[in-house]
Structure formats: structure tokens, C-alpha cells
Design a protein with these regions (language model features):
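Short alpha-helical segments and helix-capping/turn motifs at coil-helix boundaries
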Residues: 33-44, 160-161, 185-191
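Terminal amphipathic helices with adjacent charged low-complexity linkers/tails
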Residues: 1-2, 58-89
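Generic, well-ordered alpha-helical scaffold segments in large soluble proteins
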Residues: 35, 40, 44, 48, ...
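N-terminal leader/propeptide and maturation segments of large enzyme subunits in energy/redox metabolism
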Residues: 86-161
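Thiamine diphosphate
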Residues: 61-62, 161-241
């Protein structure tokens, strides 16, 4: 297995497909092109992924009670998913990012204190590695595992204080999912606001060029001349750039 991983890096198209998908058996419409994109993203970032999902097809095949296609790996890590209103999903996802960043900043201060003033060398070494990779998602996960193990072995009061929020120690990959009806039309102002922030956040637009979940009505993403509901004679305006 390790030989394959070394030969085909996960940062390549082929190499990414040797990673476990953390989205499976979605129940989407036959031939739907949306789940494969989400599956690929979970292969790359799923074990540390937060998803803010705009109401639409992605919330129907993505988390219709009582089941969900999002799953966890053998370590129990997988995407954390939540659904928002159609009109404010970008802001909702941005809020998720700011909230977990605030918690991590608090944890960072505590780890810095342990590294500077602690007496347990294992905790200090693991803490320094965690601090060095604080903003690097690809390597911070492994550093977090080492830090958690060292803190659990230590058992001191400061360690227990940090471990109380251990789920927030690892650097997260924040994603915002939604369709073109959300991103081009109803939630466009929020998308613009979030992208303009320059923060470390990702937006995935499932652009079907119509309002898919409500039956195929035209959106600002629909191309000129396309026939859709509310555009039976062909859409008169061009696709929003």
C-alpha cells in the first residue's frame, strides 16, 4: 500500500483516486454529475472538512433524514456537514470558519504556554510541532495526533483543559456547497462578500445552469437561447460572467 502511495501522490489526479472516498451511496438521480465532484473533494480533504450546504439538490442527496452519504474513515474522521437557508449559506459557512478559528486561536495560546512553561518534554516537543504546522492543513493533522497522545499521557490540568476541545486542534478545510441558483442568484451577495474577505475558505458551485431541485427553472447561470422553465422560448440574456 505504501509503495502505491509513494508512486502516485495524492496531489495528482490518479493518486487522489487511491484515497478513501468519504461520500458514498448518495441516492442522487441516475446520471447526476454532482456527487462525483463532492466525492473527489472528500477524497482530498474529507478527514478535516467542514461543509456549509445551501438548500438545494446537494442537501437532498447530501443529507436526507434519516441517512447521509457522508461517512468517516477508520479513525472516525469525516466531513462535518450542516445545511443553511438558501439566501445566507455563504455567510453561514464564513461564520463556521470564524468560529473554529477563534477556538483554535484560544487553543494556540494554551499550547504556547505549555511549550514555554511546561515541564513535560514530550508535550513540549509535540506542542512545538503543532505550532509549527498550525496553518498547514496537510501536516497539522499528524502533528495534532502526536499532541493529543502526549497530552493524554501527561494527564495534567493544562493538558485536560486543551483536550476538552481536542476536536478543534487540527486545521480544518472549510467548504461552502451550493448550486447556481444560490451562487449566481439568491446568494450572490454573500458569495461576493466571502470571496472578497481573502480568508482560507473554499466555494464549490454545482453549476447545472438551472434551478435543478425545483424542476429546472432558468437562473442567471443559464446560457443564451437555452430552453428551461420560465424560458420556454429560449433565454434572452447571456450567462452571468
Amino acid at each position: 500500500k505504501q509503495d502505491v502511495i509513494d508512486k502516485f501522490k495524492e496531489t495528482t489526479v490518479k493518486g487522489s483516486q487511491f484515497k478513501q472516498p468519504l461520500l458514498e451511496f448518495s441516492g442522487a438521480c441516475a446520471g447526476c454529475g454532482e456527487p462525483p465532484y463532492a466525492k473527489l473533494i472528500t477524497q482530498l480533504f474529507g478527514d478535516r472538512m467542514y461543509i456549509a450546504n445551501a438548500t438545494g439538490c446537494t442537501s437532498i442527496w447530501g443529507n436526507s433524514s434519516p441517512s447521509t452519504p457522508y461517512t468517516a474513515n477508520k479513525a472516525g474522521k469525516g466531513p462535518a456537514w450542516s445545511n443553511s437557508l438558501f439566501e445566507d449559506n455563504a455567510e453561514f459557512g464564513y461564520g463556521m470558519l470564524l468560529a473554529q478559528r477563534a477556538i483554535r486561536d484560544g487553543l494556540k495560546a494554551k499550547v504556547e504556554d505549555v511549550v514555554a512553561n511546561g515541564t513535560n518534554e514530550d508535550v513540549k516537543a509535540a506542542g512545538q510541532e503543532w505550532l509549527d504546522t498550525f496553518a498547514v492543513g496537510a501536516t497539522n493533522g499528524a502533528a495534532t495526533d502526536k499532541l493529543v497522545a502526549a497530552l493524554e499521557a501527561c494527564g495534567c490540568d493544562k493538558a485536560k483543559e486543551i483536550l476538552a476541545q481536542k476536536d478543534f486542534l487540527a486545521k480544518k478545510s472549510q467548504w461552502i456547497f451550493g448550486g447556481d441558483g444560490w451562487a449566481y442568484d439568491i446568494g450572490f451577495g454573500g458569495v461576493d462578500h466571502v470571496l472578497a474577505s481573502g480568508k482560507d475558505i473554499n466555494v464549490m458551485v454545482f453549476d447545472t445552469e438551472v434551478y435543478s431541485n425545483t424542476g429546472g427553472q432558468s437562473s442567471k447561470s443559464t446560457k443564451t437561447g437555452a430552453i428551461a422553465q420560465f424560458a420556454a422560448g429560449g433565454k434572452e440574456t447571456k450567462k452571468k460572467d
